[in-house]
Structure formats: structure tokens, C-alpha cells
């Protein structure tokens, strides 16, 4: 029921035409922006696909995966941009390389090779890029970042998506946007939780600045334990 509702709502957001293509999602894919519109994590939580109309699409996503190392490490890739045409394609899946070690993660961050596979099993023709520090400028949300990117002459720019009105809420206030860059260190965190939820909480806590961590701890102490 929930997944069907999510698919229906998103289909209405992106097009008034009939739904013609399914973007398959895996747990490692963190979908951030689609066709210039922010994707809410709570809206997509638990969904294994996203319904889109046929035609040109641009997605911004990250690869986030708990590596089976000792201790466990949560790998997070730089934000990746890919543009593809879904014409005459019923489904599209993002095919990632094997990322099981820190070395795999570093290699993917440095040279993110992946494919978009159509329902016929063949790779689609795509344009891709990495969202880097110089793309950010003074932008504060992912939607404004992508709007600025799309008016530029970059590998995966789509000018048509630069004019889409921003969502009412396109980013969590106080959240920083990790990006790739020459002077940006690769971030990993050693995690010791017993489940993925606990590991994710640890990871995002470590990503926050000291003031945000303090506010979170104050808030957490006030919450009842269920």
C-alpha cells in the first residue's frame, strides 16, 4: 500500500502523462534529486522502485553501503549525476561495481564507473558527472545546487531542469552537503552498532559539526525509550 502510494504521488509530481518507466532502486542507492526535484528520504524509505514518464531524466544520487569489514565501515560515495533517455524503455536499473572493501570504495570515489541497464539487459547511453565543490558556490539546498549546475556547461547539465520551481522543503536545515573535490578528504566512519539503523545514526552523528552534535544529544536525552 505504502509503495503504491509513493509511486503514484511521485508520478503525479513529475508528469501529467501516463507512467511509462520504472527506475529500480537498491538499498545502496540514496536518491537525492530527480529532474531537478528533491527526493525526500522519508518518502522513498522502503521503496524498491520509482515510476517515471518516458523521456529524458537526470538523477543525483549517492552510493551508501555498510562494508563487511572488521570493524564495520559505512562507505558513502560523492554525489553522482547521470542523465539518460527512457524512451522505449520499461525499466532501468543502476548497476554498480563490487564495493566490499575500503579499497573498492576509494577506487569508486576516485573513478565512479557504473552502468544504467535497460529492461533488454543492455546498457543505456548516458551522460554522467560528479558534483564537485566548485558546483556549490553559495547554494544551500540540493535543488538550488542542481539548478545552478544545469545552467552551466557541464557533462550532465540539462538546462530544462534548471527552471523547475523548488520544493517547499528541499533540504534539512543545518545539513551540510558532502561533495567531491581535490581538497576534500574521503570520509569513513568505524561503526559498532548491532544493526543498520544504529550504524546509520552513528554515521550521521559523526558527519555533523560539534554544535549540531550537541543539539542532537540534548534532543535525544529528552526522548522516551520505546
Curated annotation (Swiss-Prot):
Pfam families attached to this UniProt entry: DUF2057 (PF09829)
Signal peptide: 1-20
Keyword annotations from UniProtKB, A to Z: Signal
Organism superkingdom: Bacteria
PANTHER family noted in UniProt: UPF0319 PROTEIN YCCT
Family named by the database record: Belongs to the UPF0319 family.
Protein name as catalogued: UPF0319 protein YpAngola_A3206
Species name: Yersinia pestis bv. Antiqua (strain Angola)
